[in-house]
Amino acid sequence: MKQVSSGRLRSAKAEDGAQLLRLWALLFDEAGPTSDEPWKGHAREWFARYVDDARNARFPVIDLGGPLVATAIGTLEVGVPNPQCVRGRTVRLANVITLPEHRGQGHGTMLVLDVVAWARSIAADRVDLSATPAGQRIYERLGFTVTSAPRMKLVL
C-alpha cells in the first residue's frame, strides 16, 4: 500500500454536506449520482443534525485541498447491555468510500482507524460494520472479525 501523501484527515464541517452526499451516492451508483432521489434530502437533513454532535457521530474526511476524496461515518447506537456489549454502546461504521482515482493510498485505513479511535474515546464496547467482499480483507487486517450471525433487514 502506498503512503498517504499530502492528504489531511479532518472532521467534516457543515459546509461539506454536498460533497459528502456526492461521495455517499457513489456507494449506491458507481457511475456517480444521477438524480435527486428521495434519500438524498433525508441524508442532507440527517447530516446537518449530527455533523456537530461528537458524542453520537463522527464524520472523518480526507481533504487534499480540492474536493473531498474520501469519507466514513461512525454513529453511536445505544442498546441493552449484554455479555458481548457490556455497556450497550456500539459504534456502527458505515459509508467508507474513497474516489476510485485515490484508492490504494491508505485513505480508507486512516478513516477506519479514526472512527475506531473515536469509538474508544466515547467508551463504546465495539465497532460493527457490513463489509463488501472487496473491503473485508482490509477490515480483517485492522482486527475486525466475521461474526456468526448474518445481518438481516426488513424494509418498511
Regions from the PLM with identified roles:
Residues 112, 119-131:
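Conserved GNAT acetyl-CoA-binding A-motif
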Residues 61, 67-76, 92, 97:
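Conserved beta-strand in the GNAT
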Residues 48-60, 92:
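A short helix-loop-beta-strand connector motif used in the catalytic cores of GNAT acetyltransferases and
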Residues 72-82, 86:
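A conserved beta-strand-loop-helix scaffold within acyl/acetyltransferase catalytic domains
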Residues 8-22:
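A short beta-loop-alpha structural element at the N-terminal edge
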Residues 79-82, 128-130, 140, 145-156:
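Conserved catalytic-core motifs of GNAT/GCN5-like acyltransferases
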Residues 28-47:
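Conserved GNAT-fold acetyl-CoA-binding loop/helix
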Residues 102-114:
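Conserved acetyl-CoA pyrophosphate-binding loop and the N-cap/start of the following alpha-helix
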